[in-house]
Amino acid sequence: MRIADNKKAIFNYHIEERFEAGMVLEGWEVKSVREGKVQLTDGYVVIRGGELFIIGCQINPLGTASTHVRPDSVRTKKLLMHKDEIRRLVGKVEQKGFTLVPLNMHWKAGKVKCEIGLAKGKGEHDKRDTIKDREGKREVERAMKSRSR
């Protein structure tokens, strides 16, 4: 079940490859994720010391959060992947133009997972093409809908 999508990443980047990673979350974060209080748009993934971290992903605390814990909504969260997958990612990210971006957050077997994408930035022209394609699809859907009535 999907929790949150990063539509901006799909618009701004060509996604070359997708990977699934587990997330290390605190208790209040899991409760907020369950309520859907997640925002991935400003998030990105970095590799430090052979480990993956997601930065800029915002998980807003619930109003009923505990008083003895100070929730930090944009704290850096560790991502869990196998070492060989991380090594492969390091090799690809070192190539010019590649970056890692969070694509979506979802539940899998009761655990929160984050789908990250190996991405290459789009130019302005590519973004305009994406908008044109999207508008064309909308027009076709409208025509089909009005035709079926």
Curated annotation (Swiss-Prot):
Pfam hit, one: SmpB
GO molecular function: RNA binding
Main subcellular localisation: cytoplasm
Region (Disordered): 121-149
Keyword terms: Cytoplasm, RNA-binding
Location(s), subcellular: Cytoplasm
GO biological process per UniProt: trans-translation
InterPro entries reported for this sequence: SmpB (IPR023620), SsrA-bd_prot (IPR000037), SsrA-bd_prot_CS (IPR020081)
Family of the protein in this entry: Belongs to the SmpB family.
Described function: Required for rescue of stalled ribosomes mediated by trans-translation. Binds to transfer-messenger RNA (tmRNA), required for stable association of tmRNA with ribosomes. tmRNA and SmpB together mimic tRNA shape, replacing the anticodon stem-loop with SmpB. tmRNA is encoded by the ssrA gene; the 2 termini fold to resemble tRNA(Ala) and it encodes a 'tag peptide', a short internal open reading frame. During trans-translation Ala-aminoacylated tmRNA acts like a tRNA, entering the A-site of stalled ribosomes, displacing the stalled mRNA.
NCBIfam families cross-referenced by the UniProt entry: PRK05422.1, smpB
HAMAP family assigned to the protein according to its UniProt record, in alphabetical order: SmpB (MF_00023)
PANTHER family: SSRA-BINDING PROTEIN, TMRNA-BINDING COMPONENT OF TRANS-TRANSLATION TAGGING COMPLEX
Protein name: SsrA-binding protein
Source organism of this protein record: Polaromonas sp. (strain JS666 / ATCC BAA-500)
Lineage: Bacteria, Pseudomonadati, Pseudomonadota, Betaproteobacteria, Burkholderiales
